[in-house]
Curated annotation (Swiss-Prot):
Coiled coil: none
Topological domains, Extracellular: 29-237
Annotated source species: Felis catus (Cat)
Name this protein carries in UniProt: Junctional adhesion molecule A
Designated gene of the protein: F11R
Record InterPro entries: F11R, Ig-like_dom, Ig-like_dom_sf, Ig-like_fold, Ig_sub, Ig_sub2, Ig_V-set
SMART domains linked to this entry: IG (SM00409), IGc2 (SM00408), IGv (SM00406)
Superkingdom assignment: Eukaryota
Family: Belongs to the immunoglobulin superfamily.
Amino acid sequence: MGTEARAGRRQLLVFTSVVLSSLALGRGAVYTSEPDVRVPEDKPAKLSCSYSGFSNPRVEWKFAHGDITSLVCYKNKITASYADRVTFSHSGITFHSVTRKDTGTYTCMVSDDGGNTYGEVSVQLTVLVPPSKPTVHIPSSATIGSRAVLTCSEKDGSPPSEYYWFKDGVRMPLEPKGNRAFSNSSYSLNEKTGELVFDPVSAWDTGEYTCEAQNGYGMPMRSEAVRMEAAELNVGGIVAAVLVTLILLGFLILGIWFAYRRGYFDRTKKGTSSKKVIYSQPAARSEGEFRQTSSFLV
């Protein structure tokens, strides 16, 4: 209880200092009683915004999340895209039922009609959604000495989930060298992205791997277990493949040489250069006239 009381006193001091400094500078004061709001999905949410020092205040609310920006309230009225689920009051805006898409930063902007006085404050809304079952990509085999990447992700958790890896049911530490059970392995683990990288892969890395997603809300979710085998490079198989390729190439060269010795290529050449003879019938000729009309074309 003492901690809550101290936090309340700090909040009151901040509010008082904001109001006094704004009045001293001749500006309006805009503040919120709860700058960080966390609400489960499908529940109502109140975003507070209070102000003072405005003769005729005009209130607007803006929403921003990543590249998305939209206007929730304009000139003290909720915009059409939010009208069916948000209400406006002079103390803030209220969502009747929030969805995960409502997560983001809401800025309350207050000005007077003349535009001489202006102030704003931001409220972070986080819609709480438990994580779903994560999807993993784990190679079934990895060559010892190479680099292997295992990934884990899920799309529903809000706030975003953190990811923890397990090998044969034992949670993998961030620093393998500091743990006796994992000191023979060399890997890096990113709990934010869910990526597990072995570099290089060792024989000890053979085992069943699972990934767990958790975000502090709802139950943690685990993936299916997938086994990864760490194996030596199959040098014998590579050598055998090279030998088979060389033998086949040798048979091909021998076949071409045999066909050449048998004269198959010469016969083909002679067949394509054989002569053609065309005979034409002699035309009728008049008496006393002799003309050669038969011709041979070679």
